Amino acid sequence: MKRTLMIVIGSLASLLLINPVSAENPQQVQQLLNTRECPGCDLRGADLRGAHLIGADLRKANLQGANLEEANLEGADLTDANLEGANLTAAFLTNASLNQADLDGVNFTSAVIYDADVTGASMERINLTNAQIYGTGIAVGGENP
């Protein structure tokens, strides 16, 4: 009996290691992709690479650690969203609202950020390598005065 129990426990443990638990809510990811409306959604760690999220409502959404590489977020409302540690490599953020957003540790490598509103956003440890930034309050050392 003990041997069988140990085999079952060992099998379950190996399954957990093979299929890591994902933090995002799959229904909310689908809701976002289908409707572009997901205010307050839990999208932590979501894989949204290449997603077309033009004009998306992501106010107060939790996108901590999400992969938004090459995502189109033109005109998206990310007011008060948590993007800490998110990957926005080569993302397109023209006219996006990032008011009061947590952008700490975000990777903006090669991102296009034109006329985005970052009023009150937290921007510590962001990576702006090769990013194209125009008309936006992001500069070396933080927000422009």
Regions found by a protein language model. Name each.
Residues 1-7:
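Bacterial N-terminal signal peptides that target proteins for export
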Residues 10-11, 21:
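Cleavable N-terminal signal peptides
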Residues 7-9, 145:
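Short helix-onset patch at the extreme N-terminus, typifying the N->h transition
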Residues 2, 22-145:
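Tandem repeat scaffolds
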